[in-house]
């Protein structure tokens, strides 16, 4: 079968579930993953064919997409900050908003990183996307990453090897940690922050497939992780150290107030590309 003809079937099969742009995105992601071809290749070579084995591969993916399984989990990989990452049901799928957080940290610290060996800690590392992207772009930094899930850490370690960076990974429940036993110049975290009351806003592909441990917090203590990490930061950030958070867009004011209670200074609350409160930076002492 010609790929261009199969494309018509593919689009029709998903039309009742996804919008046209999303289906088109799926098609070209798979085209590149399975055939190392881009959109322009299909335009230039419209007679490209699928053999029976290739057709079966596409149909297998199509069945999973109909169940709204994320394309990143189906293929087992994604891109983040221009780097390749393995992902699975033990790790969140990295978001564009988190890329904005990484970009902010790099811009703020690129110059100082060339002058000193920064120590950076990523709390709740998941796939390792934040820690690895920082290590790749701040090559003089010593990067540490914590997660409570041994399965997530196993994936993060594979991603560190894939991207040729050295990260110190630590399995630890941050909520049961009283001290980190060393000082860091930067602590960054994208902890669980989605309240249970917000589940009605969450799409099926997230709710049914991504790890709830990394997503949700109780409604009556939605800043639990922020409070604990902030407490640790007061003990384990160096002088003039920086604390960065990705935050719940509905809790920007509350998160700022929490940080100010711990006497952090120079609070900066930033919006993401969609205009939502999404990240915070504060300085220590």
Curated annotation (Swiss-Prot):
Catalysed conversion reaction: L-glutaminyl-[peptide chain release factor] + S-adenosyl-L-methionine = N(5)-methyl-L-glutaminyl-[peptide chain release factor] + S-adenosyl-L-homocysteine + H(+)
UniProt binding sites for substrate: 190-193
Transmembrane intervals: none
EC top class, as a word: transferase
Key words, A-Z: Methyltransferase, S-adenosyl-L-methionine, Transferase
EC number: 2.1.1.297
Record protein name field: Release factor glutamine methyltransferase
Native species: Flavobacterium psychrophilum (strain ATCC 49511 / DSM 21280 / CIP 103535 / JIP02/86)
């Amino acid at each position: 079968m010609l790929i261009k003809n199969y494309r018509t079937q593919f689009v029709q099969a998903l039309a009742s579930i996804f919008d046209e742009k999303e289906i088109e995105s799926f098609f070209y992601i798979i085209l590149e993953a399975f055939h190392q071809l881009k959109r322009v290749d299909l335009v230039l070579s419209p007679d490209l064919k699928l053999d029976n084995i290739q057709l079966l591969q596409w149909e297998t993916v199509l069945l999973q997409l109909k169940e709204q399984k994320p394309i990143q989990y189906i293929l087992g990989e994604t891109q983040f900050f221009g780097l390749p990452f393995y992902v699975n049901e033990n790790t969140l799928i990295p978001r564009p908003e988190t890329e904005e957080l990484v970009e902010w940290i790099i811009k703020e610290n690129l110059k100082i990183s060339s002058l000193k060996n920064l120590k950076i800690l990523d709390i709740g590392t998941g796939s390792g996307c934040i820690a690895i992207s920082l290590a790749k772009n701040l090559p003089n930094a010593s990067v540490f990453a914590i997660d409570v899930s041994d399965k997530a850490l196993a994936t993060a370690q594979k991603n560190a090897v894939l991207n040729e960076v050295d990260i110190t990974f630590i399995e630890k429940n941050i909520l049961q940690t009283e001290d980190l036993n060393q000082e860091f110049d930067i602590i960054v975290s994208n902890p669980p922050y989605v309240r249970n009351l917000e589940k009605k806003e969450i799409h099926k592909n997230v709710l049914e497939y991504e790890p709830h441990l990394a997503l949700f917090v109780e409604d009556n203590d939605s800043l639990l992780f922020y409070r604990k990490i902030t407490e640790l930061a007061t003990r384990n950030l160096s002088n003039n150290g920086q604390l960065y958070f990705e935050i719940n867009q509905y809790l920007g004011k509350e998160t700022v107030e929490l940080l100010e209670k711990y006497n952090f200074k120079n609070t900066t609350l930033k919006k993401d590309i969609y205009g939502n409160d999404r990240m915070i930076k504060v300085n220590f002492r």
